[in-house]
């Protein structure tokens, strides 16, 4: 027997538990006798023998442990999705609209002399950074809101560094100022704190002290004229409510397949997560835009903080811990634009996945030590809101569907029950699809796309949990806008071949190759049709890997 194999057997005997050793040593000896002839034939035989033993005593136990963990996460996620769906069904059946649950009356303006004084002062904040393609739309929509001109201040928080963007914003503000709109263009000489820093700086101006509420819109959001008339009454008549959040409506959902997939995911977020949180717990995550805050509540919660990339969620959790309640109004929609380039969408998802994980790390003890909210709400915040929806869902989706399931074809000893591979995923997918009935025929594409994106979300989640690398990276989501969209897409088409290198995403290609290999192995040696899923999923990773998702704008 070669010294190499003797050393391996020594390690095996040394590391094996004593109770396990007596039973297994004879098995090893017998295995050695039967394979000793092969072992003596050369180093290849030794490597094969070592691989078999390592496979049995190292890889299989680890994989079985991972399968068990994934099964537990699958069950937790399934229960959470069913719970939210049941809540939404009861809300719809009982017709528990926000106007019925909370007091809501239109503002009385019958008395001409007192009409304007019945309207509270409202600050409208529009933070932006180098967004010349869409800034005119948001500023114009905010200035067209149906609200007395002397009871409204439009505040444009422009952190732009691009001279063309600055000039365009200033020109737009001047145009509306000449029409009698009380509009302020506030420019900082730095970008400290990014969006949170801009919003915080905007609240420090003296003229803000006269305002009771603040409405926030990102640069690509276009509220309807009656937005304030439909949301402010909730805050006027219900003093315990601090936030009114409205739904997003996507103006470019039909632009490409990727935007359709985003529409499906975000519709579910609003229909299920926001609706259930508002109805049962009077809490949900502020979406950062298309919402109205009570300024007193915002200040009591500590104002805007830039410790994470989800300053909106941070503020919402802190306000909740002070006892404030939120209301989600599903019927009030605010038009906005989805990111249509894969690069922009990846940056957005990194921020949306990394930030909540990092915030959970920072606020868990603060939530537990809080004395103003009930233990039930603390449990909801830590477990449902953060752990399941912001941590488990990302890690489980990637690890289970993109790593564990493909690996099971290489290790027949791994048994995954059908409820985890068929019943639970099917139920969750159907529940998600109900939020966007017009896209039911795209379910297969949505599943494959979400699995691809889960890789980036999982990576971002671990970065947030560990506070590593890009944990505080803030990249403004690129929006093409309607005015320049056709021009930019045409430019991308003409440079398709010369800019191909910009499209390549090596992580997607690596994962796609692994899943494709597992599919080929299952096709050759498996006894089922599981390879069909593996080939489809690998194709989805390949398509993302070569950048053929969404529109493409080459770097100049």
Curated annotation (Swiss-Prot):
Q: What Enzyme Commission number(s) appear in the record?
A: 2.4.1.32
Q: State one molecular function term (GO).
A: glucomannan 4-beta-mannosyltransferase activity
Pfam families for this protein: Glyco_trans_2_3 (PF13632)
Check the record and name the Gene3D superfamilies matching this protein: Spore Coat Polysaccharide Biosynthesis Protein SpsA, Chain A
Q: Which reaction does it catalyse?
A: GDP-mannose + (glucomannan)n = GDP + (glucomannan)n+1
Localization terms from the record: Golgi apparatus membrane
| Function recorded in the entry | Probable mannan synthase which consists of a 4-beta-mannosyltransferase activity on mannan using GDP-mannose. The beta-1,4-mannan product is the backbone for galactomannan synthesis by galactomannan galactosyltransferase. Galactomannan is a noncellulosic polysaccharides of plant cell wall.
Protein name from the UniProt record = Probable glucomannan 4-beta-mannosyltransferase 3
Taxonomic lineage per UniProt? Eukaryota, Viridiplantae, Streptophyta, Embryophyta, Tracheophyta
């Amino acid at each position: 027997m070669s010294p190499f194999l003797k050393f391996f057997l020594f390690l095996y005997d040394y590391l094996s538990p004593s109770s396990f050793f007596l039973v297994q040593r004879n098995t090893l000896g017998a295995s050695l006798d039967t394979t000793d002839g092969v072992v003596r034939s050369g180093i290849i035989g030794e490597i094969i023998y070592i691989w078999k033993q390592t496979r049995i005593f190292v890889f299989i136990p680890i994989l079985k442990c991972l399968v068990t963990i994934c099964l537990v996460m699958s069950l937790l996620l399934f229960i959470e999705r069913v719970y939210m769906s049941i809540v939404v069904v009861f809300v719809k059946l009982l017709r528990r609209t926000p106007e019925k649950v909370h007091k809501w009356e239109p503002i009385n303006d019958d008395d001409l002399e007192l009409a304007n004084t019945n309207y509270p002062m409202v600050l409208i904040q529009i933070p932006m950074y180098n967004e010349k393609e869409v800034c005119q739309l948001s500023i114009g929509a905010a200035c067209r809101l149906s609200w007395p001109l002397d009871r409204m201040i439009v505040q444009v928080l422009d952190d732009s560094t691009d001279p063309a963007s600055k000039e365009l914003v200033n020109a737009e503000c001047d145009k509306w100022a000449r029409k009698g709109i009380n509009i302020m263009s506030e420019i900082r000489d730095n970008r400290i704190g990014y969006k949170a820093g801009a919003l915080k700086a905007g609240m420090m101006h003296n003229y803000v002290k006269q305002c009771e509420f603040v409405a926030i819109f990102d640069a690509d959001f276009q509220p309807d004229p009656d937005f304030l008339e439909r949301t402010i009454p909730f805050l006027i008549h219900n003093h315990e409510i601090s936030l009114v959040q409205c739904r997003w409506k996507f103006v470019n959902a039909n632009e490409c397949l990727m935007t359709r997939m985003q529409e499906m995911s975000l519709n579910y977020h609003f229909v299920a997560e926001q609706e259930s949180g508002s109805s049962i717990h009077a809490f949900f995550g502020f979406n950062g835009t298309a919402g109205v805050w009570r300024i007193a509540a915002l200040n009591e919660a500590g104002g805007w903080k830039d410790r994470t990339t989800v300053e909106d969620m941070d503020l919402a959790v802190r306000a909740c811990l002070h006892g404030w309640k939120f209301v989600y109004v599903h019927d009030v929609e605010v038009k906005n634009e989805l990111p249509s380039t894969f690069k922009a969408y990846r940056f957005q998802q990194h921020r949306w996945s990394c930030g909540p994980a990092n915030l959970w790390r920072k606020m868990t003890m603060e939530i537990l030590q809080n004395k103003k909210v009930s233990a039930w709400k603390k449990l909801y915040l830590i477990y449902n809101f953060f752990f399941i929806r912001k941590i488990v869902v990302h890690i489980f989706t990637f690890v289970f569907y993109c790593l564990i399931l493909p690996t099971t074809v290489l290790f027949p000893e791994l048994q995954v029950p059908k409820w985890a591979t068929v019943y639970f995923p099917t139920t969750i997918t159907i529940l998600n699809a109900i939020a966007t009935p017009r896209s039911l025929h795209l379910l297969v594409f949505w599943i494959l796309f979400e699995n691809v994106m889960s890789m980036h979300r999982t990576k971002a989640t671990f970065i947030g949990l560990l506070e590593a690398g890009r944990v505080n990276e803030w990249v403004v989501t690129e929006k093409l806008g309607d005015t320049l969209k056709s021009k930019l897409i045409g430019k991308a088409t003409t440079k398709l071949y010369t800019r191909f290198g910009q499209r390549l995403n090596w992580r997607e290609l690596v994962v796609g190759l692994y899943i494709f290999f597992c599919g080929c192995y299952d096709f050759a040696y498996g006894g089922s049709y599981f390879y069909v899923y593996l080939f489809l999923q690998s194709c989805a990773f390949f398509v993302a890997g070569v950048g053929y998702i969404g529109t493409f704008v080459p770097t100049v």
